[in-house]
Amino acid sequence: TATGYYTNNTPSGAMRTFGVLQPTFAIESLMDICSEKLGIDPIELRMINGMKDGAVTHTRQVLGKVAYTETLKKCSEIAGWEVGSSRVRGSVRKDIKGSQIAEPYIPGKEFKSEEAMKLCRDRFKYGRGVGTGWYGIGRCATIDKAGAFVEIDDGGTAMILTGVSEIGEGILTVLTQIAADELGMYPEDITIGDNDTARVPEAAHVGASRQTYMIGNAVCNACRDVKKKFIREMAAYWNIDSSSICMKNRRIYVEGNAQYNLSLKEAVDICKKIRGIVPLGSGTYTAHHDGLDPVDGRGNPWHWNLGSA
């Protein structure tokens, strides 16, 4: 049995990296309070204090590229946010400028009856606000790793095998796009196979926003491996230098030479039936960390980081 206690702590879990949402909510709330008291636009205050390239974290890690202010600036441009007093920001402003002009929202306008519109206006307030975040991705206590297999199949298509789990984050689409780009195919030519970890390489856990970075790189490396082998076999068949061969738009060819230009389907047939080779590739990706000092907490836990707005 278990006993649960109701407290004033925010419910938490592993959604968008462990332990980030809860303090971010508090920090962003305080940033708005500070901007109000100081009379500084909330976006301007965040631009002044936000993480920038070369920033040092609380663990003394020196960051490389940090996209926080860049992301916030782009978001403010799209939203048509004009710098000014935080007291006058909101959807009723007439002087909004930006790449996309936002029309003021009229509460209840979607309702047909006056009574429903009035009820909506009395209950809800509408305006605009800003929220930002920054965090590192992947495992920070241990080495993070992932692996993948790729096979170029009959018909000039490809099969990706990895232990990735799709729980709604869209990783299968991302891996399909990565593979298609690397192999010169279209997304519809890519199939993501069974993720039974007894038969496919480890992809590790779903969480900490790591899948695109870790598994995406593993798939990318696997595609480059099979592409190199595939081109090598076709170069031997054509008796030419492999460095001159390209794979793009479902074809394998030498630029400007019609003599060496085949569909991937035709090339796979040659590779299998004449060369006797099944085009297979494998790839791994590892993010190395030096861990954290158990005494003072210093270290470089993050291999990459994200900024959001």
Give the location of each predicted region.
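A short glycine-threonine-serine/GTX helix/turn-capping micro-motif
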Residues: 10-23, 208
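Phosphate-handling active-site elements
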Residues: 183-187
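Cofactor-centric catalytic regions
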Residues: 1-5, 26-29, 36-38, 44-159, ...
